[in-house]
Amino acid sequence: MTLPANRTGVIAKKLGMTRFFDETGQHVPVTVLSLDGCQVTAQRTVEKDGYTALQLGAGAKKPKNTPNAMRGHFAKNSVEPKRIVAEFRVDEAALIEVGAEFTADHYVAGQKVDIQGITVGKGFAGAMKRWNFSGLRATHGVSVSHRSHGSTGQRQDPGRTFKGKKMAGHLGQETVTTLNVTVWKVDVERGLILVKGAVPGSEGSYVKVRDAIKKAAPADLPRPGAFRSAGEAPAQAAAETPAEETSAATTEEGEG
């Protein structure tokens, strides 16, 4: 039996949360993810790089704010500069042409996905908030130190605090992957993916969405993916321009 090729994930922008009501009347909290111009910016092949992967980019970025090296990289592949770039390992059969732009029907309703993002930073936090410690007693000899974490070591031997000891420190702002998130709905026209529950990150941050690695993928998934080829996007943009505006622009050029 031949297993289907490993598909690429996508980079999405977290817009926020809302809720829907299912057929039983229960409200379902969902997170809205937007495919903010997610395109293939480069390919990685075994012959050239030693592995197979797709480099994706998302979010518009001004060329003047793009480093020269990355500006040349994007220009070489004929794509606009991107705000964020990430790689996804894929099988050779799942490689997609450079410049292709992903659409929301890359995923289907009911599918399980894994979502990776950077959690909201909360600054310096004590042990009770950071690690859910119970704290010290309220009375019986305890003064001032009610919310402290208590002892940090043992005795003369080993005579030190072990690395990794749970103590007060920086909370949040770390990479977290939420597994087996359910896709509630996709909106192809607006490029939105709605998933049940919360995902890591603040509003406006970018997350990586991929097929769940611990759950079987639906049989009706598009392979190698759902996307518009590099030549289709400009034509579609031109088609969306109203005829009145086009004729008016032509008239103004003639008068000038």
UniProtKB/Swiss-Prot annotation:
Q: Which domain of life is it from?
A: Bacteria
Checking Pfam families in the record gives: Ribosomal_L3 (PF00297)
Q: Write down which residues bear the modification named N5-methylglutamine.
A: Q156
Classification via HAMAP family: Ribosomal_uL3_B
- PTM: Methylated by PrmB.
Region annotation Disordered: where it falls in the sequence: 217-256
This chain belongs to the protein called Large ribosomal subunit protein uL3
What are its GO biological-process terms? translation
Biased composition range(s): Low complexity: 229-256
